[in-house]
Amino acid sequence: MPMDPQEARLLDTQLAERLADTRLEAARLDESLAELLRDRADGTADDEHDPEGTPLSAEWSRMAGVREALTRSLHELEAARERLGAGGYGDCARCGRPIGAARLTARPTAELCIDCARRAESRRR
């Protein structure tokens, strides 16, 4: 069933807000990563043997992992808005059935219905 235009506008606004928040978070993290890179470039920093704190390399790895997750979130949010604009939001990308309101409420960027998501997850294991 097609989505009500008012509901679609509300959802698009919510997705746009999440996208803006995620972009802002990614920009802040990029600034922190750049600062950490400058710290790592400082040849006098021997933090690997400092018992007081986290080594720069460990912090870099952690932050890079967070940035990777933010990048995935950005792509998922952009794709959800594209599906919404094209009229395919809420339809499973694999089987075409409706995704289900509860799943979309919990995960607005979901591309797969719960059955297809479970099958995809079991194949990855």
What are these regions (language model features)?
Residues 94-95, 115:
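Short, cysteine/histidine-rich loop/knuckle motifs that typically chelate Zn2+
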Residues 89-90, 110:
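Residues immediately within or flanking Cys/His clusters that coordinate Zn2+
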Residues 99, 120:
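Cys/His-rich microdomains that often coordinate metals
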Residues 109-119:
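Cysteine-rich micro-motifs
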Residues 102-107, 123-125:
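Short Cys/His-rich "knuckle" micro-motifs
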